[in-house]
Amino acid sequence: MTHPSAPRARSNGKEPEKEEPRCVHPDLTPLNVKDLDNKSSSAITNENVSSPTLLPFTERLSAIQPQIPNLLALKEPENGKNKHPDSEQDDGDMKEQRSKNLSPESDDPLLDHRHLQPGDTVSLLSHKATLQMYRDNAKKTNDPMLSYELAVFMLDVSRSLEFSQQMLSRGQDPAAESEQLAKEAMSILRRLADRGHVESQYLAGDCCMNGYGMSKGRPDLGLAYSYFVQAGKRGHPDAAYRAGTCYEKGWGCRRDPAKAVQFYKMAASRKHPGAQYRLGTAELNGELGLKRLAREGVKWLKRSAENATPEFPHALHELALLHEKGIYNVLFVDNEYSCELLAQAVEMGYAPSAYKLGVNYEYGRMGCPQDSGLSIHMYNIAAQQNHKEACFALTSWYLVGVPGILPQSDTEAYLWAKRAAEQGLAKAEYACGYFCENGIGTPRDLGEAKGWYQRAVEHGDNRASSRLNTLSGYTAKPVGIAADEASAKNLPQAIPVQPLSAPFPSAAPISTMRTLGVANYPTPKTMKETQAMQRDLHQQALVAAIEEREKPKTATPTSPQGPSFFGQKGSQGRPSEKPFSPSQPPKEGGKPMSLIAAGPRAGFPKPPTPPPPPPPEPEPDADAQLAANPKSFKSRLLRLGKMGKIRKGAASEGAEGEDAENVAGLEVPEGEEPLSATEKVPDGNEAPKSAPNADADKETGLNKDPAGVGEGAPSPKPETGAMVLSGPKPLGQARGQPPALTPGPSGPSSAAGADGAPRLPGEPKQHTLGDSSKPEAADKMSQEATEKSKDVNNEKSKNKKSEKSGGLSFFGLGKKIMNKGSDKPGSEDKKNQEVPKPSDEASPSIAKPTDTPAPLSPRPDEKNSSLVERSKDSESTSPSSPKPTTGSAEPSVPPMPAMPPSTVVRPSPSMALVPGRLPAIGAPDRTESNPVPASPQIGGIVPSRPPPPGVRPVMPGTMMTSRPFPPGARPGMPPNAQPGARPGMPPNAQPGARPGMPPNAQPGLRPGMPPNVQPGARPGMPPNVQPGARPGMPPNAQPGARPGMPPNAQPGLRPGMPPNAQPGLRPGMPPNVQPGARPGMPPNVQPGARPGMPPNAQPDTLSGLPLNVNAPEANNMLQLHPSAASGVRPPAALQPSLRPGPRPFSPTFPSPAGPSRPNPHLLPGVSSSSDGATPRANGHGVKPGSPPSMPEQHSFAPPAMQPGRPPSPSSPFGRPPTGPFSPSAVRMPRMPSQSSMHQSGNGPSPPKPGQMMNVSLPARTNQPHLGGASPRPPRPTSPPPFLTSQQPNRPPVPRGVMPPGSGPSMRPPQPPAIIPPPPRSPPARVNQPSLGPPGSSMPQGRMDMPSGPTAQGQSPLSKAMVSPPKMSSPDRPPFAPPTHVTPPKTPAKASGFSTPDSSSSKIMEFKDAESDNLNFGSATTTENAAAVGEDKSVRKKWLGFL
């Protein structure tokens, strides 16, 4: 490698010294000198270089990479780089190619100064020399890019002169020189902008906007706006964005949001992130005249985030905030993606995003881990950009410090708070005032503190006002930016401190790691060592505390439910009421050892210490208790086999020494203490001293013990897991057999294990901790003690019958409370004491204990000794005391009545209870708040008293909280009820039965059903009916049959059809008719023919009247169409009116005036299909003046209930009307209003000339001209003639009238003169009982004919005169619907039944079934009428019961 200072070889007679300044100049060091030297050395090897001066310059141009991409930064072509300098032609080609890239006026490569660009390469030459070179080039050439480059360089120099005053001053004013350079650059830019140079226009507009290079430094917004608009229209994205900003803010122009949006979209289309962000926020907030569209706004924000730059990272931050909360149906919540967007913005240096991430890392939000180091780092990035919230956050961190990351410094905390307060943060101003008032991080200055408090009050901090009151006597000093500027040289500068050992790259220079606080900070190494020592000491303290707590424990785990559940010695380590947690490490030498042994240094904060937990409870010293009373403790544990009595006596004698007689069960004279000091129960559980009577026994044995639960507890409620002692030993248990496991309130316990642990039969006995004697010695001592106590116990058993002393025993084994209150368990105490029971009659089966049961007492170190003390108030029954007495301290309290045997739980075969003998239930005393616990799994009883008010009775062997019934039973049930039964059910009811059902009812039945009914049947059905049958069907009907069908009918048939009919036929058709025929047609008619046609007629032929009209058809036609020659005229109100209505109507729904007000202009017809209704119930009308009833489902009314259709005589709807006239559809001439109505499209097509018009009444309204909305399809018509019987008083039918069931196409054209015009009369209301003459049997028109079932032998109108209609009667028929002028479209159906081709057949059946109408939209047969009435009465009966 050739050194740059080495001399060069001669070339073309030129000295190499002339080239030395170009190659050895010290300012060339930033360039790649290695590449230059290598290339120049390669050129030196060739002596035939024609132009040596071009080679270093050419290679240099190819090596320099421009810093700012613009049009001046043109790279050399590839052929120019790789040309070898040997040939002259190659060098000429290179010069020619380079001249093309330069200005056309100059071919001299020396004039190309593209390597002299503003930025880092400016230092290659001095400013003065570089400016001179640029000026020379600009004068010699007219290239706009070179002039633009000169202007840019001048602006950069003018700005950098402020920071290099000492370098360029030399007697000149740098400010004046800078202003002169700026003005010169601005003149060049304006000249280029006028010539149309886009870059110059934008840069000139920016200078005018900032006032740079302008006269007096004032901005010219109008000139800037014009330059921005010109450049923006030429496609400059930044200029378009700035032009949109001018239009939005009104800078240099009038505000025009539409123009602003136009320029923003122009810039956004060229991927300008600022314009895209502004459009996104405008769409989200509905600004700039745009609609508020969140989806479009999010789209613009996403595009801006994709094109984000360090100058415009705002979209990343906003999009992250949107993902944090989400936008409904637009943007979902994604915390992880939100943090990722924030991190991208932080990489671009966006301060708000850095602060947001700092908060997340400090508090662990948005899925970020809680990291102090990262939080401080993010706060530092934001604080370097003077983010006020981040500066104040650093104040908080400096106040507490982070070991190993950030040292604690009050000075740094004050400086950062001051920086935040200078930017107007109210809480930072208050903090600065507090620091100055108390001298934290700064000298105490109350005047300055008052000044900060005043600024905080001005910015809305209410806490500063109270502080100002305390500083009323001081003068506030000026604080803030003004005071800092005045004394900027005297105040220290806030230098951010780089966190120590931070898990992130350094964001501050190394020189800024020095702090301004106390100089005696601990080093990171010292801090780590101190923290390690603290952790070790704390760990050692915890380990020592755990070992101390687990000393009395063994390897056997302790049960949380009981002291002796897991095995031997488990009760010794029974956990106390409060868990043990040491508040400090063990003491050494009587002084507590501090956790921070090293101690904090000056400036090092103490670590925050947790609040001290409550002091631990002292653990009972089992060894001391066993040493003080080892024999007595062991005697209460060894109780197995026939030697239990001897062992107990020997242990009692060895336990007390001189008091052995008292312990063995001897009488103690009054005034003597039966127990020694060492015999007392620990933890304050003392045995009662004396109990001369029941009252004294209650005071000493029950109320005196204050520590039933724990130490110092006032309530005698037993602790969880306490041992439970209960009544006598069950039958069948040998004396040597261990008692069964007895679960206490929290778990089972045993009476036969050492240390209270359960021991199964046959398990060897265990020795407990502290046993100083062997079993052999214990047996020997027991024998001696037993021999001494035999006579005394036998004498005492004779006098004990009259004494009242209560106590609990474990199968008859346990301590006895003597009349003096001594704790003396005797071998024959079971014979000498009476056990109070409810009554002998109530519990005759209580098992009597054996002759010599071994006593049982709990361990003295257990805290549940209060249970034993309280259990002494009741004693199990002995053979010598057959008469029971109550164990209550108050003899006046009666015992609780005995519960039935079903309430006694028998979980094991060891429980033996005679069926007639039951345990008593009650509480130990009315004055106690907690009962005596007992075991529910022992066969004995717990003598007790009735429970106090508000307390549940106690089951034997259970806590007070347990229920006095078996586990499967519920409260409020009898004792002998089964577990699955519910309250309110008889005891012998089955578990699956429901309340309110008889005991012998089957489980699947429902209330209100007879016991012998099948489970699948429904309420209201006879017992012998099949499960699949429905209500109203005979019992022998098949499951698939429908109501109203005979029992032997096939399942596929429909109601109203004979049993032998074919399944495909429809109702009302004879059995021998063909399946394709329609109802109402003779059997031999063709399938395609329609009703009313002769059998030999063609299906589509329009003929006159049928030729073979038989008597039934004539009767049916006579019923619906009376002749004028009969002499019988209908009432005036029922005569049709030829006056048309004011407007066509379509009464689909009832009018608002009422559901049953027909239009008086028209008569009811057979083709009614609207939802009008007549207020009929049970076959009677409405009283005069009564309001109309509420309409029911009128569209589902059966055809037999339509106006103008009488019911069949065989149907249960009632007898046929007795009147001679039945109003029906009459043939009327076609009126103009009718034709206009049909043409309007609201009704069906008009009938052909000569056909009959069926006119029916609509719903009655106050306005006769108003009708419904749209017509409904016509309803099925009356039954065919062959299913209706001959009715009297029927005039012959005229030949000109068609049956109502015939379709419109089958009606033969008849001259209108055949039907005589009815007399004109004023229209009157129908559906009123007053229309007919009083006392007459003629109904008020067929519209009001009853269509529901009536009582047999009762006229349809007989009941209507005395009772109003019922709104919810079960047998109320649907109202007869009003009709409109519609020719019938469906043929007549037999018996009025709905057919499959009717749209409402299924709905009609469903509706009738819901309204308890057993007719299912039709008239039932005569043979089923009685069954229907009977079934309805049965249902009424059951409904009344429910």
Swiss-Prot record:
Residues 39-53, 1232-1243, 1392-1402 have a biased composition (Polar residues). GO terms for cellular component: plasma membrane. Residues 633-648 have a biased composition (Basic residues). Residues 605-617, 964-977, 1139-1158, 1200-1220, 1271-1282, 1306-1322, 1371-1386 have a biased composition (Pro residues). It is a lipid-anchor. SMART domains: SEL1. It holds the Pfam family Sel1. Residues 12-25, 75-99, 762-804, 821-840, 859-875 have a biased composition (Basic and acidic residues). Sel1-like repeats lie at residues 198-236, 237-272, 273-309, 313-350, 351-387, 388-425, 426-461. Signal peptide: none annotated. It comes from the Eukaryota. Residues 747-758, 876-891, 1295-1305 have a biased composition (Low complexity). Transmembrane segments: none annotated. It is found in: Cell membrane. InterPro entries: Chitin_Synth_Reg, Sel1-like, TPR-like_helical_dom_sf. The keyword Hydrolase does not apply. Keywords: Cell membrane, Lipoprotein, Membrane, Repeat. Residues 1-54, 72-117, 550-1402 are annotated as: Disordered. Activator of the chitin synthase CHS3 which polymerizes chitin, a structural polymer of the fungal cell wall. Belongs to the SKT5 family. This is Chitin synthase regulator SKT5. It comes from Malassezia restricta (strain ATCC 96810 / NBRC 103918 / CBS 7877). The gene is SKT5.
